[in-house]
Regions:
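Accessory, often C-terminal, charged low-complexity segments
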Residues: 1-41, 45, 54, 61-70, ...
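Short glycine/proline-rich turn/loop motifs
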Residues: 37-41, 102-120, 249-260
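Short catalytic-loop micro-motif centered on adjacent basic/acidic residues
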Residues: 47, 146-150
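Cofactor-binding loops of NAD(P)H-dependent oxidoreductases
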Residues: 51
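SAM-dependent methyltransferase catalytic-core segment centered on the flexible catalytic loop
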Residues: 65-146, 211-234, 301-302
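Conserved proline-anchored active-site loop of SAM-dependent methyltransferases
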Residues: 67-86, 163, 285-299, 308-309, ...
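Short strand-turn motif at the edge of the Rossmann-like AdoMet-binding core
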Residues: 77, 151-153
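Extended, hydrophobic alpha-helical segments in both membrane/secreted and soluble proteins
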Residues: 130-133, 147, 159, 266-275, ...
Length: 407
């Protein structure tokens, strides 16, 4: 079977599955009790879910969010065949110790039970995931809404074919090239220094805001045509023109204050530009592969309402901390809850999966910090409605502390 034929079969299956969901939701006539999400008009400004994005989008549709999103940004795995790590930094002032350890962030290897990433079975599993998410995202979008799909050279060519089929070729708006300086190089091919973001509209009457950028193509001489407003800075004379489809924005540097250690973290400047281009204050926007929450923070900062999810404990915790630190009202939901026992401060044992890849010295130090200064492992705390406190540690694990334990 040819690849395009296989892709078409995957797309048609995804459409059929989404259509079946729409029929079930419509025939029910009410929000299923198990969904747990508030109705669109009753939701807080920001919703964050820990769970599989396909399941979360289906639940949102079941709760009446179809057509509610003005913008959806998707930054899925790229089918790179690699497993990614996050850097977790721990500082114990009590012990005078600092520790930096690498822990699993997410896997970008794919299997359907027969093969791994790179195999035909693995590729088919990946494209099945992508097609289903794109179909669901389209259903969540408003008629004036835009989808932004962020990929790279591994799969963007096949994703374009998918989007043409799901949204329609006539709904393609742009292929944004995000150009950056970071990354390696090799003698085997030209250095790869960009990602690609495909932009599609749901319908013909879409909304988009094109920003302006400086154009210095006249050197130091002022423009001589009447009616053209020109400006001067230290570089020379320039006019303001509609922005182009190549965006030069640096990656988050290793020493940047913005950096939180999560693998493949995207810069806030890139996220803010997408938010501004595709939405207005008060609009609902979504990121259903939210990672450490950069898009959600950008949206909240710019006055948008947001909804996002990630299946990783660590990613969801980092995204929540962004909202918490910014003082933005949000509600956190867990579809894949994995909490520590009530009252536990997160003691680490030799069997703990988090310790498996650590060096012996790092493992010993982490166990010592957990034993003698457990508060150093706390990323943040929140109060629960019943008066208990919820603690989230630097690895994204959760525990609940009752009021009596503080007495």
């Amino acid at each position: 079977m040819g690849k395009l034929t296989a892709l078409d079969n995957i797309i048609q299956a995804a459409k059929a599955s989404a259509a079946e969901l729409s029929e079930v939701t419509a025939s029910a006539g009410h929000v299923p009790a198990h969904t747990g999400f508030p109705a669109p008009g009753e939701a807080p400004d920001h919703i964050l879910v820990r769970g599989d994005n396909n399941a979360v989008m289906r639940q949102l549709l079941a709760c009446g969010y179809g057509g509610a999103f003005q913008c959806i940004y998707l930054d899925p795995p790229f089918l790179s065949g690699a497993d990614y790590q996050a850097t977790v930094r721990i500082r114990s002032e009590k012990l005078g110790e600092e520790l930096s350890v690498k822990v699993p962030a997410y896997q970008d290897t794919w299997t359907d039970g027969k093969g791994r990433g790179g195999s035909e079975e693995g590729r088919e599993a990946y494209y099945k995931m992508l097609a289903e998410n794109l179909v669901l995202a389209r259903q969540l979008l408003a008629d004036t809404g835009l989808l932004w799909l962020h990929l790279d050279w591994h799969t963007v060519h096949y994703a374009r074919v998918m989007l043409d089929e799901i949204f329609g070729e006539e709904r393609f708006l742009n292929e944004i090239i995000w150009q950056y300086k970071s990354g390696g190089s090799t003698k085997k091919h030209f250095a790869r220094k960009h990602d690609t973001i495909l932009v599609y509209a749901k319908a013909a009457d879409y909304r988009i805001h094109i920003d302006k950028e400086k154009s210095y193509n006249r050197g130091l001489k002022p423009y001589r045509f009447k009616g053209v407003e020109e400006f001067e800075d230290e570089t020379g004379w320039y006019t303001l023109v509609n922005a182009k489809d190549v965006w030069q924005i640096d990656m988050v540097g290793r020493t940047s204050a913005e950096r939180n250690g999560y693998a493949t973290q995207k810069p806030l400047a890139l996220m803010e530009r997408i938010v501004k281009a595709s939405s207005e204050e008060g609009d609902l926007i979504g990121d259903f592969c939210c990672g450490s929450g950069g898009f959600l923070e950008a949206g909240a900062k710019l006055g948008r309402r947001t909804a996002g999810c990630d299946r990783s404990m660590l990613a969801a915790a980092l995204a929540e901390k962004r909202l918490l630190d910014g003082g933005y009202p949000y509600q956190r939901y867990d579809m894949d809850a994995e909490s520590l026992p009530e009252g536990s401060d997160g003691d680490f044992t030799g069997q703990d999966s988090l310790l498996g890849g650590l060096k012996p010295a790092d493992r010993t130090m982490l166990q010592r910090i957990a034993s003698e200064d457990p508060q150093a492992l706390v990323l943040f705390e929140t109060a629960l409605p019943d008066g208990r406190r919820r603690k989230v540690d630097v690895f994204g694990r959760e525990t609940v502390i009752s009021c009596t334990e503080d007495a």
